[in-house]
Amino acid sequence: MDRELERLDQEITLELQKIDGNLSHCFDVITKQVIPRVVAYGQVCDAISDSCEWLGTLCKSSGVVDLKRDVLLERTPVRDSDAHGNAHGDTHGNAHGDAHGEANAERSYGDVAGGEEHNSTVQSEVSDSTMGKYREDDTREQGEDDSVQRQKKRKVSLLIQERYGSSSSVMPSPDKRVPQQSLGSSPVKEQVPLPGTVIHFSTK
């Protein structure tokens, strides 16, 4: 009976030693492997949380802040100093530029006026020469028409003379009609020859 108890006691002791060894091993694993990894993971999570919080703050701030106004406020001192420096330069430059611009404007106005006067003179000369040419052409055409009409009339008169005799034989002159010796005689005794027949043709 005692031997059985001793044997059981030894077996229990061995089992407890094994359990203690396993617990020690588990403790070592947890202490040396798990806990450092958990700590590292916690640090990473903290960094992620901080980053997310910073991003959230940045988004909120960017939604509220007026960037243009801030930039203008930052650049205002520089612009004020530049404006004071440019005011004197602009005043002097504008005065000189205005005087130069007025001189250029007067010169341009004179050039334009001279150009318009020259153009009007040239146009008047061209119009006068053109009108003179048209008048010469009209005069020439009118002279040609008159010469053609005269030629037609001359041809008609020549045809009449050829057909009915000369104009002197058609109508005798007053000298041939009344002889000089019969001027003092009675008109009853003297017989005046009858005039010849005269035919008139239109020469239109």
From Swiss-Prot:
InterPro entries the record matches: DASH_Ask1
Keyword Cell cycle carried by entry: yes
Stretches that traverse the bilayer: none
Keyword Transcription set for record: no
Annotated segments matching region Disordered: 78-204
Predominant localisation class: nucleus
BP GO terms, sorted: cell division; mitotic sister chromatid biorientation; positive regulation of attachment of spindle microtubules to kinetochore; positive regulation of microtubule polymerization; protein transport along microtubule to mitotic spindle pole body
Keyword list, A-Z: Cell cycle, Cell division, Centromere, Chromosome, Chromosome partition, Cytoplasm, Cytoskeleton, Kinetochore, Microtubule, Mitosis, Nucleus
Molecular function in Gene Ontology: microtubule plus-end binding
Composition-biased stretches (Polar residues): 120-130
Range of residues in the leader sequence: none
Stated family: Belongs to the DASH complex ASK1 family.
Described function: Component of the DASH complex that connects microtubules with kinetochores and couples microtubule depolymerisation to chromosome movement; it is involved in retrieving kinetochores to the spindle poles before their re-orientation on the spindle in early mitosis and allows microtubule depolymerization to pull chromosomes apart and resist detachment during anaphase.
Protein name from the UniProt record: DASH complex subunit ASK1
Organism listed in the record: Candida glabrata (strain ATCC 2001 / BCRC 20586 / JCM 3761 / NBRC 0622 / NRRL Y-65 / CBS 138)
